[in-house]
Each structure stands twice: as C-alpha cells, then as structure tokens.
UniProtKB/Swiss-Prot annotation:
It comes from Methanosphaerula palustris (strain ATCC BAA-1556 / DSM 19958 / E1-9c). Its EC number is 2.7.7.-. This is DNA primase small subunit PriS. Catalytic subunit of DNA primase, an RNA polymerase that catalyzes the synthesis of short RNA molecules used as primers for DNA polymerase during DNA replication. The small subunit contains the primase catalytic core and has DNA synthesis activity on its own. Binding to the large subunit stabilizes and modulates the activity, increasing the rate of DNA synthesis while decreasing the length of the DNA fragments, and conferring RNA synthesis capability. The DNA polymerase activity may enable DNA primase to also catalyze primer extension after primer synthesis. May also play a role in DNA repair. It is an enzyme of class 2 (transferase). GO terms for biological process: DNA replication, synthesis of primer. The gene is priS.
Length: 378
C-alpha cells in the first residue's frame, strides 16, 4: 500500500472515530482488548492484553490511536489487562458463533454476503427453536468483512468450558450424528435434525435418480462397503426407498446395509450434503473460551465497513453494502490495477483499470481491500 493510500484511509478512520461514540460490551471492566494498527509493513501484529476502566477511556483511545481493527474478549476476566493468559483469571465467556462466507462459498462479494446471511437465519432458528435460547440473549453482529458473529449472552452458558461448547456446535453443524438415535419409531420426525437428516437423505436419493445411471452406479460402487451389484439394487429400488422415507416408518430405511454404507463419511457427496443441511459455522471460534471478537460499531480495516450490531428482527432487511457504509460521496481519485465491479450504497460502480474518480465510500472500500490506490498527485 502506498503512503498516500495509507494516509487517506487513516484520515477517514480518524474522522469516523472523532464523530462516533462506540457501543461497548457488557462488563467492560472484565474484558481484554486487542488492536491491529495501520502500518506500512507487511507483518500484521496485534497489540493486546489491554483493559479499560470506562467507556470514555476506550473512546479516547480510539480517537487517539485510530486502529484498523478493534477486538475485545468474549471472555470475562478478573484482571483482563494482565500480560499473560494465566494471570488474567478466567471467570466465564459468552457463547460465540462465527459465520464466514469464505468457509461456505466462493463468488462475488455481494453473492457471498447474501449466502452467509442465509446461514445466520438458519443458525438463529436452531438456537431459538431447538436449543431454547431466548431471542433477548442473542445478538447478531455483521463483522464488517465477509460474515456475521452471533453472541449468546445468557448467564446459563457463561461458565461452560470448551467441551460443553463443542457439544452445542456439533449439534448446530450436524457433526457426529447417529441416525439410529435420530430416526426412531415414536419420535417426532417433523422438526430438528430428524427432519433435516431425512430431507438430506431424500435429496441425495433424488439426485441419484436423475443422474445418468451409469454414472450413478459408478458413484455408488466407489463407496467403501458397496459392491456393484448392491449399488444396482439400490438404484432399482429408489422410488420404494423414497416412499418409505416419506411414509409413517422412515426408520425402516436405516436397516438397509447399502444405505448405511452410503451415509458415512466415506462418501464425500453425502457428507457435503449433510454439512450443507446443518449450519456452516466456524467450529474453533465457538469452542475457544478466550476468543477475541470484533467490537460492534468499530470499523473493519480490510473493507472500511462498519461492524454493525443487529437484533434478530433486523437481520432480514439488513444490507451490509448499504447499512454498513459510513463514508460519503465526495469525489476521490483512485488508480486500479484491473477492471472490476463494486456494489455499494445501492449502486453498481464499474471501475476501470487506471485512474478515475469514484465516491469516497467506494474509494475507502477499494483501498482497504487492496484493489486500488489513491492516485498520485490527487
């Protein structure tokens, strides 16, 4: 990044922190803070093990230091500013889920943001409808980058260790499912993982049905434990098997030896389908009881977008490419290395290779993402 570009971004961030009073997490006195600063060097370094006694102290720090990224601990500590983790005195942590589009799909920035929001809504439904968390304890935060964080601030989970959090994220993501326990006679198969599992299985069989039969036979017989003859038998009985899944006793299909072999991790196509049925959350974030997470209302140094806190009711209508933009439309000259398209503020901007004038918000976005530089002699 050129010095002029770095200075431009810092000026924009400075202006933002001068005019905004940040939202701070509950129990500010018990939180550790970490910051990454604008630096011309390539090595990214975080300054952490910091603590603030009051909101105004943090506000002045942001105004003075103007960080590129702002983080605080999901954990609560007796001495959050202690220089080592052992000295901090852990006393609990919020339950955090991280949904990052990079782990879900690849595509345009706009498409990735739309796709990851689907996962947010899926996760919220699981948390509230199946795991019983109250909506008032669930906060959604747009990360300012490619995803969202969901904070569960329920006192009932604060003392949980990594093992308990692992159980929750395993359920949410559908890891280690035992179909024999899920799909049993007399259980409600219309909700939760029983419904999702049967839906995934029916979808997989429907995929086999429309697939070229030679390719379907080759696919099935390549799975460990499935012979060519047994694969052919399953293909011939697909309609009957699917009818059983949709009938009164879907648990009967679990007795089929071929289906048991097909629905294991040895079958990557089934594994992927089942994974997509669950929530595609970043598991290590949830199990980490000392995680640093982005501060809502701060700016993301990799995009220039605001880290936006949301209630559950606000998620549906939220558009990060409009609602997380905090900069204006004054003209700024930038130089792009290649032609690209940017969707921002409800408009689509065609940016050509070379030097041109774009709105300030677009300039910040492009420069933060490393897609353009401030034009020389602007």
């Amino acid at each position: 990044m050129r010095p002029a570009t770095l200075e431009f971004i810092k000026q924009q961030f400075t202006g933002y922190y001068q005019r905004v009073y940040p939202v701070t997490p509950d129990a500010l006195l018990q939180r550790e803070w970490g910051f990454i600063f604008f630096d011309a060097g390539r090595e990214v370094r975080m300054r952490r093990h910091l603590a603030f006694g009051e909101r105004q102290e943090l506000t002045e720090y942001l105004k003075t230091m103007v960080p590129a990224h702002v983080f605080y601990s999901s954990a609560y500590y007796e001495s959050p500013g202690a220089p080592t983790m052992a000295e901090k005195g852990w006393s609990g942590a919020d339950l955090i889920f991280d949904l990052d589009a990079d782990h879900i799909m690849h595509g345009s920035y706009q498409a990735m943001l739309a796709r990851v929001k689907e996962e947010v809504q899926k996760l919220l439904a699981v948390l509230t409808d199946e795991l019983g968390f109250s909506e008032k304890y669930c906060e959604v935060v747009f990360s300012g980058g490619r995803g969202y964080h969901i904070h569960v601030n329920d006192l009932a989970v604060r003392s949980w260790g990594s093992a308990e959090r692992r159980e929750v994220v395993n359920y949410v993501c559908g890891i280690g499912l035992d179909p024999g326990l899920l799909i049993r006679a007399g259980t409600d198969l219309s909700t939760g993982w029983p419904r999702r599992y049967l839906g995934a299985l029916d979808g997989y069989l429907a995929w086999l049905k429309v697939k070229n039969q030679k390719d379907a036979l080759l696919h099935l017989s390549s799975i460990k434990g499935v012979s060519r003859s047994s694969a052919a038998g399953l293909l011939k009985s697909l309609d009957q098997v699917r009818a059983t899944i949709g009938g009164d006793h879907p648990e009967k299909v679990l007795g089929d030896r071929v289906l048991r072999a097909v629905t294991t991790n040895d079958n990557p196509d089934w594994k992927k389908r089942l994974q997509e049925t669950g929530v595609q959350a970043d598991e290590p974030v949830t199990t980490d009881i000392k995680r640093l997470i982005r501060m809502p209302t701060s700016l993301h140094g990799g995009s220039g977008l605001r880290v936006v806190p949301l209630t559950i009711s606000e998620v549906q209508e939220f558009d990060p490419l409009i609602d997380a933009v905090v900069f204006g439309d004054r003209d700024v000259q930038v130089t792009a290395e290649k032609t690209l398209t940017v969707s921002l503020l409800g408009n689509t901007y065609e940016v050509s290779a070379g030097t041109q004038t774009v709105p300030e918000a677009v300039a910040v976005f492009l420069c933060c993402r490393g897609l353009a530089e401030i034009a020389e002699g602007r």
